[in-house]
Amino acid sequence: MDGSYAASYLPWILIPMVGWLFPAVTMGLLFIHIESEGEG
């Protein structure tokens, strides 16, 4: 496996991560922030 193969394979991993993982983490942090604000 050389660098060019890894570079062409990388977007297939990154696109779902950016598309699903990042919004999920953002929503989770926002939810925790709202919940902690409401309790205090």
Swiss-Prot record:
Cited function: May help in the organization of the PsaL subunit.
PANTHER family: PHOTOSYSTEM I REACTION CENTER SUBUNIT VIII, PTHR35775
The organism's taxonomic lineage, starting at the top: Bacteria, Bacillati, Cyanobacteriota, Cyanophyceae, Synechococcales
Name of the protein in question: Photosystem I reaction center subunit VIII
Family, per entry: Belongs to the PsaI family.
Compartments, record wording: Cellular thylakoid membrane
Pfam families cross-referenced by the UniProt entry: PSI_8 (PF00796)
Keyword Phosphoprotein included in the entry's annotation: no
GO biological process, one term: photosynthesis
Listed transmembrane segments: 12-32
The entry's keywords: Membrane, Photosynthesis, Photosystem I, Thylakoid, Transmembrane, Transmembrane helix
Organism per entry: Synechocystis sp. (strain ATCC 27184 / PCC 6803 / Kazusa)
Membrane association type: Single-pass membrane protein
Record-level GO cellular component terms: photosystem I; plasma membrane-derived thylakoid membrane
Keyword Transmembrane: yes
